[in-house]
Amino acid sequence: MIKKKILIATGGTGGHIFPAYSLAKFFSKKKYKVELTTDRRGLKFLKNDLDLNIIKINSSPLIKKNIFKFIISFFIIIISIINSFFFLLFNRPSIIFGMGGYSSFPICVAAFFLRIKFVIYENNLIIGKANKFLLPFCQKIFVSYKELEGIPKNYNYKVIEIGNIVREEIINFNKNS
């Protein structure tokens, strides 16, 4: 039996990594083949106690402080989208979960061009820049809070409130004390 492959594309901060890792653990227990992408910052948060392929994405936020930094960051993002395109072309998952953050952006854009289904998850009260840009292209938007700001009304049909994705260690904290 061929395992379905799930790719989780996440930003590099703890607010992105920990929900992504919890999701990876959940799908691994359900016997899916799970891969996770993040940037160099995210690697320091991850312990690989799962059968999980972790791929480092070299990307950048779009820096608008001066024209020189803007041009450099723009080209880094374009190169990252191209690299993500070829990665997905040869490692095609069944679905992608975009967890927000600038390092999830290139994977989700490449997925759109390759017609790979992807959903996004937003765990803040205000939608992040990467997720906001991806709204027209994703299949669904999973949110922690129904009161999420920044989603235009014409995308409300895509929104599904699921709450916060919480690590198992936190859920089981009182059970083990």
PLM region spans:
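Conserved nucleotide-sugar phosphate-binding/catalytic loop shared by glycosyltransferases and other
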Residues: 3-11, 29-76, 160-166
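Structural motif
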Residues: 7-9, 97, 119, 142
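Catalytic machinery of carbohydrate-active enzymes
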Residues: 2-4, 29-33, 79-85, 94, ...
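A short, glycine/small-residue-rich beta-strand->loop->alpha-helix junction that serves as a flexible
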Residues: 8-21
